[in-house]
Each structure stands twice: as C-alpha cells, then as structure tokens.
C-alpha cells in the first residue's frame, strides 16, 4: 500500500488523511504515517538472474526515471551509449544516488559503435558510412568559435578506432592514414584507419561521437559516483556532462576525451570529490554562477588537447560569475593553457593546498574578479608556452584587474615568472549587478616563497596610460585622454600609494641570471630592480621581505622538503598542510 502511494505521487501524510476521512466512525483508533522504504534499481546491459526483472533495466535513463527521494540506481559494468537526464529531485536527507556497482567498469559515452561501412578505395582502405549529424548549424563552417583559427579545431566530430583518436580533415582529397572527413552536404563520414586495416570486416571497434551531452543533472540533491564519461561531441563552452541542479555531489568520476569541456557546473552548492578531468578537447571543466562550488581531491590534467586558443578559453578550467568557489587538495597539471582560470565577476573564491604544475600558461589566472584567497599551494613550472598574448599571465599566479586578493604561504618556484599583477582598462559584470570598472587595488601578497622563476620573481605588468602604478612623485603626467562615454566611471588621479598594494615578508631567491622585481610593461616606462632595497626606496613595496638562499631536497622529484633552518620556515613562508603529489616538511 505504501509503495503504491509514493509511486503515484501521494505522500504518506496524504494517504493517512484520506484513510481517516473515509472511516470517521473509527475515530477512536490511532493512525500512524506509513514507512516508505527506499528502493534500489539496477541497470545492466544484460539481465542479471539474481535480481527481479521488475527492478532492473537495460538503460540508465529507464532506471533514473523510476528513482524517487532516497532511492539508488546501481549501474553494472558496461558501455552505455545514451544521454542521461536526471530531472527529478532528491531531498536533503534522502538524495537520489546514481552509482557504478562496486568494482565494476561503467562508461557513459557520446559515441556509437559504427558497423555499416562500404569501401570506397580498396588499395587505401578508405571507408564511408551515413552521417546525419550536424552539431554547430548557425554558421557556414560549423565551428565554434567561428573564426579562421578554429576552422578545424572548433568542429565537434570525433572518430575512434580501437580507442585511438583519428585526426580530422576538412576536404575529402586531404584524407591520409589516421584521418576522417565529414561531408555534411551528402551526409557521409569517410574514415581511413591509421593502420590501413579492413574495418568493414568488423574486426575493429570504430566509434563516432553522435551525442553532444552524455549527462544532464537538472534535479537537486543528486549524488553521482564512480562513472566514466567520454567521447561527447560537445561544442566549445559546453560541458559533456552538465550539472544545473543544486546540492549535487559528484564523487570518483572521470571526464575524458570529450570534444570540448569535460563537465559544466552551474548549480549552487555542488561538491566534486576525487574526480578526474583529463584529455578533453578544450577544458577539464567549466563553471558559471556555481556559487558554493567545492572541488576537493580532484585531478585536472592534459586538457585542451585540440589546441583551442589559450587566450580565448582553454586549459584546466574556466570559472565565471561564481561566488565562494573553493578548489582544494587537487592537482592541476600539464594543461595546455592556464591551470586554474577565474574570469569575469567572480567573488571571494579560494584555492588552497593544491599542486599547480607545468601548465602552459599561468598556474592561477584570476581575471576581472574579486577577492581571491590563494594559500598553501605548490605552484611550479608554469607559463613556458609561446603565447604572445599572455604578457602578464605566464607566471605562477597572475592577478589581472582583480582587487581585494590575499596571496600567502605559496611555494612559487621555477615558473617563467613568479607573481604577476596585470593591468589594463577593464570592466566586468557583477553577479548581482551591472558592469563596473575593475582594477588591481587592496592586494596583500605576504609570506610566499618566490624562487628560481626564470624571468623574474615579481612583475607588475601595468599597461595603463595614467601611470597609477608609480608613486605620485615618479609619474610623468600624460596628456589628458579624449573623453569617452565611460570616462566618468573609471578611476582618475590614481597613484601607487592609493592602490594599497602590500608585498610583505616574502622570501625571494632568483637563480643565476634571473630577475628579482620588474615594474611596468616593457613597451612603456618600466624598471628592473636588482635589490629589495631599491624596491623599497622607489616603490615603498617589499616590507619585511628578504632575498635569501632557498634550497629543496629534490625539485625535479617534487621533494620540496627544506632544511630546518630554512628562511622559508623562519619567515612563515612555507605551506601548511598536505598537498597531493608533493613531499613537504623538514629534511634533516
């Protein structure tokens, strides 16, 4: 009785009321609310004999559709070629759980297994099949973005032979081994395997991406665990898995080999725990208005494998218009762009106890946003790609027109540049309001180690005509700028004293031939300071800082233990807490 009531949307309380109303002569009896037991639904490619047929399904979508608050959908091992939509809600104390069965390998893929091939060129083993799919239909080149740079990169099609990715060409006569071509006019897909094998014999597994999303969680209070997501044909700036509901928990999942972004988070209070974002075409993940996002114990590595423009949107992640995001105890490594990128109107975000290493652009790039707290991180080996537009953003940490930040107890070692302030004339939308001017001010950079960074340990890249980054006494008054519609909104008469930039108690150690403290962009007035005394005398920055030898046990092995008498320890510049993949502490 109670199970039927719940399945038909009738609450246990409603059932009791109807029962009492129908039997008023029995008013002396006491009626209690029926107990509704949570159910477990099973999903498996083939029937499991030990489970009732009424409790198992062939597709995840069928199982999810039956789930109610407190239920669990257990997915057994298999490759599931479907798009799963979760649009019902759990409850705070009764979330809906969707998880891989213990010890089983579960994949949700955007690719179908293609078997209907015809050979078109016997000596070269070029094959053709039907292709009714079009993913970007709003411009002539079927790409996003629609510029020439992304003419090929911005396409969405993907083909895999035995798990190996084929390259794409834009003309049929350019086919070579290991490539494919999509003819949208004739709706044909042409494939030439890298090993020239006969794929029509069905001895090879040929998969092609046909779904632009593999998962969309719209509901609140949903838990996802232990699933691998891959091979979606999503366009740039679109997640292969999308999480738009609130209070979602994603644990032990992998997002990989998608055409663009592995996942997109836009609900509030989402927790992402022990997940891997790897080998995605554009980004590991994106987030927008994902207030309270917490990413903990995750690995974000080798993303932007298609080569999207690093200065547009590419690399480990991009987070926009989000308040209170926390990235902790995670690794952001070897991404082809920034390791961590916050851009546009973010507020009060935190990055702590992370390894941020060997990313092609900045380790952390905090752009036109507010109030970053970055502390107790190891940030090494970032910024060495040739990205001409990345001036002021080829460093361990770059604050780009982003005020009210606190940067403390980070090891910023061995990057192209150590710490950057990047300034242009910028505005940003606010989370709860219209756009406004934004610039670097009220910054606290304290108790960090900045050592062995190739070009310099600190560089203030201020590309502004008003010379705000110089003390008033050092400014060369520029001619008045022409009036513009937004002139009144932007700050005027600024000087370094008014910016309230604090560099305090940092430890600096340039290696041989490396810079210490640069100020100003190279194409305008700038200085290269060779001593902290000169920095203090001219800029009044660097209070309590020291230039002193900094040594580690083995930088290449990320054994960053230091001697007990290290100045990093004495000055309080050494990270506290554990950081994944790094050995920290005192070495005797």
Residue ranges with predicted function:
Residues 1-16:
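N-terminal secretory signal peptides that target proteins for export/translocation
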Residues 34-37:
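Sec/Tat signal peptide C-region and signal peptidase I cleavage site
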Residues 248-249:
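Mature catalytic domains of secreted/periplasmic carbohydrate-active enzymes
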Residues 40-245, 503, 514-515, 524-549, ...:
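Extracellular polysaccharide-degrading/modifying enzymes targeting complex plant/algal/animal polysaccharides
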Residues 211-215, 230-245, 260-270, 278-545, ...:
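Glycine- and acidic/polar-rich repeat regions and solenoidal domains
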Residues 18-32:
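Bacterial N-terminal signal peptides
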